[in-house]
Amino acid sequence: MGKAKVSNAIIRRLPRYRRYLGYLQTKGIKKISSNELSEMIGYTASQIRQDLNTFGEFGQQGYGYEVDKLYREINKILGLDREYKTVVVGVGNLGQAITNYTYYYKIGFNIIGLFDVNPRIIGNVINDVEVLDCADLEDYVGREGIDIGIICVNRENAQQVADSLVAGGVRGIWNFAPIDLVVPEDVALESVHLSDSLHALSFMIKSKEEEGRDLHTAK
């Protein structure tokens, strides 16, 4: 009998738990209760306990959670106790920013390959990694055993890049192109549409302005 599928909502909450636990570690805090975590994070204590119990028993009733232990366990759950060979395809402003962001390397996402189609960029060295021609992407991915491809190209070329990554044997794709990619079921896909978040922020600003006008009118 296989493992029960973990809901997407729980998966989205786990990195937030990890982030707060990491903060507690920097403050030297050794244990914390679900109620205290609830006050910090904003989820209910029962929600936190339920999420964590999905993966096992990490706390003790009346004692709470050991911060260091829970942080390590969440790392294991998220697969952050290993390293991933990673390539970035599209080395414009976003691709360069991702390549130069040291945090990704600290948590095991080692960017060892960079690819672009621009002759003026090919051959450049960014963070000690040479930019290669996208024509060589599929062969490189297969030869080097790349785990993850990060797509930072325009929407017109994103699916072709994804196809090359899949053909080379990647296990996951982090997509920043403004398009919904099609990949096989056995390839993990996480798409980040940055403009969607900005649109949501715009809506929230507009809503608060309307609420303010309504309150002013009601007086």
Q: Can you say where each PLM-predicted feature lies in the sequence?
A:
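NAD(P)-binding Rossmann-fold cofactor-contacting core
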Residues: 105-127
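Extreme N-terminal segment that seeds HTH/winged-HTH DNA-binding domains in transcriptional regulators
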Residues: 1-30
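Hydrophobic/small residue at the entry helix of a nucleotide-binding pocket
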Residues: 94
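Phosphate-bearing ligand-interacting subdomains
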Residues: 17, 22-25, 129-219
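HTH-adjacent hinge/linker in prokaryotic transcriptional regulators
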Residues: 31, 35, 40-85
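Glycine-rich Rossmann-fold phosphate-binding loop(s) that bind the pyrophosphate
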Residues: 91
